A protein has these predicted regions:
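Short glycine-rich loop/turn motifs
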Residues: 30-32, 54, 133-138, 146, ...
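Internal maturation/activation junctions in enzymes
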Residues: 66-153, 165-166, 173, 280
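Active-site rim segments in enzyme catalytic domains, especially the processed small/beta chain
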Residues: 13-18, 146-210, 234, 238
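Extended C-terminal subregions enriched in glycine
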Residues: 74, 97, 191, 224, ...
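Extended C-terminal regions of large enzymes
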Residues: 44-49, 202-219, 231
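Alpha-helical support elements that line or immediately flank enzyme active sites
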Residues: 1-11, 214-236
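Accessory "access/gating" subregions that flank catalytic or transport cores
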Residues: 1-47, 116-130, 138-139
């Protein structure tokens, strides 16, 4: 009945959905991608999502000694994220249409080669444009299972199209396609677009540590990287890792900084060639959640940038 309602509405409003589209669609169990980072195993969803950007950046950062409040550490993280996003936007698409396998991008040898590009100055490279988002993330656990879950209809109310009588707002993930000729993510029939939603999961010494995630469109992989660095490099607890001030790479090679990042760090980054500015809107820097299993206890943390909370019952 729901499928019929969708089809009738699509036909009445000039939509392109067909019965064959709905019949061909099915959820998929996928094998997550992972990398080892300084004692943690970091798990992310594979393409057609942007989880690979998190792992690419961490592979680059593995070769650096990162320290809290060290301006150089900010520079290195920003450059690693820019390189990771450049690869992600160029190669990630529906996995049936990708030119490179994720394993090739995530090889440690490739990371070592790319790491040499990170020097004493900001790289003169422009990233593709970002787009707005509308995403919800939650992490949950009990005595037996742990879940990292994310859902998004993309821009606010998605397409803005509500199917009468259903309460369902249709998403507009088709906006994630490219129109560039020859790009693996170019729009086409039966293809799935590049998308932003990436629930994460961490393990230590082969044992599950717990789910984590950061809502926020193209801030998601950047938030994941900064949370993992806080945990693995700086030894922070989950709440402190979420609380820590963040940066974000945005279009035009600009870097946004939260007000909590010291002025001296901003000046240092400017001297290295970064275009930085402070942004007071905390919602732009993602909203995260974490649940970890520590021994017999579960530890929850919630980002102060949103109205979420850690709740036990």
């Amino acid at each position: 009945a729901l499928a019929e309602a969708l089809l009738r509405f699509s036909e009445a409003t000039g939509g392109l959905l067909t019965r064959e589209d709905l019949e061909a669609h099915a959820p998929e169990w996928v094998t997550p991608l992972s990398t080892e980072y300084k004692g943690l195993t970091v798990w992310e969803l594979p393409p057609n999502g942007q989880g690979v950007a998190v792992l690419l950046a961490l592979n680059l950062l593995e070769g650096f000694d990162l320290r809290p409040e060290d301006p150089w550490s900010y520079h290195v993280q920003i450059e690693a994220m820019r390189l990771a996003l450049a690869d992600t936007y160029r190669f990630v698409a529906d996995p049936r249409h990708m030119e490179l396998a994720p394993a090739a991008l995530l090889s440690k040898a490739y990371a070592a080669e790319r790491r040499r590009l990170i020097g004493e100055r900001a790289l003169p490279r422009v990233l593709p444009g970002l787009r707005p988002e509308g995403t919800v993330y939650l992490a949950a656990a009990d005595g037996e299972v742990m879940v990292s879950l994310i859902q998004s209809n993309y821009q606010g109310f998605g397409s803005g199209v509500l199917v009468p009588g259903t309460g369902i707002a249709l998403q507009n993930r088709g906006l994630g396609f490219s129109l560039e000729e020859g790009h693996p993510n170019r729009v086409g029939p039966g293809k799935r677009p590049f998308h932003t939603i990436i629930p994460g999961f961490l393990a230590r010494e082969g044992k599950p540590l717990g789910p984590f995630g950061v809502m926020g469109g193209f801030m998601q992989p950047q938030g994941h990287v900064q949370v993992v660095v806080g945990l693995a490099d700086f030894g922070l607890n989950p709440q402190a890792a979420l609380d820590r001030p963040r940066w974000q790479v945005v279009p035009g090679d600009e870097v946004l900084l939260e007000p909590g990042i010291p002025q001296a760090t901003a000046l240092f980054l400017k001297d290295l060639g970064h275009r930085v500015r402070y942004e007071a809107e905390y919602g732009l820097f993602g909203r995260g959640q974490v649940v970890f299993r520590l021994g017999e206890a579960l530890v929850g943390a919630s980002d102060p940038r949103a109205e979420g909370l850690a709740l036990a019952w």
